[in-house]
């Protein structure tokens, strides 16, 4: 079954609020085998909403509306759909009683326009609103399914989970949708796609969807099957084929992130970390401390932006700063080794480079060195040539730090 989500509200068109409902619904619908092929946003206008309904009826089996169920004159969704389907609006007695009780409890006047929220399409299945006033509803008519939901996410989401999804399962084939996201770092989207292009071209079940975001690449693998275990087997087979080719860049699944994976390995191996940050100015340390319980592995850091701090606090030799420069492999090595010693950690990591927009020390923006000093291991410096804005270069440098830390910890 194919669905279209129609979000109603002028505030969405004006960009005053984000349409988070559509994202939530698309994910939930996909999980029960309903394909969402279109998202539509329309303002609080009867004529344009009617046009949107007519277009959606031509291309979708299910029309899901969010918003426009409230008490004001610009809440037009129910009235417009009722007119389109030649259906009457009738009061739902349970909803009316619930709304009336709310006004009595709060000592407010129960005005006529608030009764409007209890109106539903005649013959519809009514979805109780446990977190608000206006109920939702579902109606199967003329071979189409119409779902009307409130606009506020705090009302819509629990309504969907409790009442709407069980209703929608009556219209699905019983197939389960199983998805797994593979996360990669250190390889561009185009490079990764070339390595798995034949798998993407030949995809049927499961499907493979690449996405690049914040310097990372993900592959979403999605399989359909009536049996969840069989769907997982389909996913696993394709995952194995992918990792045979690009496994060196793989680091995690779904909502696993680089900094969490690195911290997890530090804890597992009982190692402590210290950082020396010039280029990143504390970004790396800030992300480290986003993980709960990190004090057991993170000693601290030094923001060594000025060369005086590099020289007098972290003891980078003056001749290195004068000859090689602060943005150099040698400087990164000294910073990593010396912050490790200074803070008595097992591992020291350093960041030095040019964020831009101008060149520095005759080195172009994006020139970056990440140093990694681990006890009983030779110090390694990773040269990077990054692109992007000043902030993007700094953020990507921190990510590369987590990536190289994670990969090195996997080896030892």
Curated annotation (Swiss-Prot):
Pfam families reported for this sequence: CinA (PF02464), CinA_KH (PF18146), MoCF_biosynth (PF00994)
Highest taxon of source: Bacteria
UniProt similarity note: Belongs to the CinA family.
Name of the protein in its database record: Putative competence-damage inducible protein
Organism for this UniProt entry: Bacillus cereus (strain AH820)
Gene name of this polypeptide: cinA
């Amino acid at each position: 079954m194919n669905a279209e989500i129609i979000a109603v509200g002028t505030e969405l068109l004006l960009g005053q609020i984000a349409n988070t409902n559509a994202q939530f619904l698309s994910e939930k619908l996909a999980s029960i085998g309903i394909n969402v092929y279109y998202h539509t946003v329309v303002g609080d206008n009867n004529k344009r909403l009617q046009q949107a309904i007519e277009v959606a009826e031509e291309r979708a089996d299910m029309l899901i509306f969010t918003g426009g169920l409230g008490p004001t004159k610009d809440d037009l969704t129910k009235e417009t759909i009722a007119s389109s389907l030649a259906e009457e609006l009738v009061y739902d007695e349970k909803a009316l009683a619930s709304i009336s009780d709310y006004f009595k409890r709060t000592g407010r006047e129960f005005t006529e326009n608030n009764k409007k929220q209890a109106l539903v399409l005649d013959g519809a299945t009514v979805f109780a609103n446990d977190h608000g006033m206006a109920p939702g509803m579902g109606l199967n008519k003329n071979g189409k399914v119409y779902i009307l939901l409130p606009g506020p996410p705090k009302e819509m989401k629990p309504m969907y989970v409790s009442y709407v999804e069980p209703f929608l399962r009556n219209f699905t084939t019983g197939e389960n949708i199983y998805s797994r996201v593979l996360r990669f770092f250190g390889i561009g989207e185009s490079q990764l796609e070339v390595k798995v292009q034949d798998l993407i071209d030949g995809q049927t079940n499961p499907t493979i969807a690449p996405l690049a975001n914040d310097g990372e690449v993900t592959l979403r693998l999605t399989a359909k099957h009536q049996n969840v275990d069989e769907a997982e087997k389909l996913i696993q087979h394709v995952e194995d084929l992918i990792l045979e080719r690009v496994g060196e860049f793989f680091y995690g699944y779904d909502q696993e992130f680089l900094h969490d994976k690195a911290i997890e390995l530090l804890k597992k191996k009982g190692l402590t970390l210290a950082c020396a940050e010039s280029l990143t100015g504390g970004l790396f340390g800030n992300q480290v401390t986003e993980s709960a319980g990190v004090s057991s592995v993170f000693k601290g850091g030094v923001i060594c932006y000025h060369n005086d701090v590099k020289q007098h606090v972290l003891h980078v030799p003056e001749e290195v700063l004068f000859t090689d420069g602060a943005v150099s492999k040698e400087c990164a090595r000294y910073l990593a080794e010396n912050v490790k010693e200074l803070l008595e950690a097992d591992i020291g990591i350093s960041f030095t480079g040019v964020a831009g927009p101008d060149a520095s020390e005759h080195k172009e923006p994006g020139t970056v060195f990440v140093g990694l000093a681990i006890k009983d291991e030779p110090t390694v410096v990773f040269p990077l040539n990054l692109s992007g804005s000043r902030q993007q270069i700094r953020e990507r440098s921190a990510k590369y730090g987590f990536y190289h830390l994670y990969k090195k910890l996997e080896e030892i």
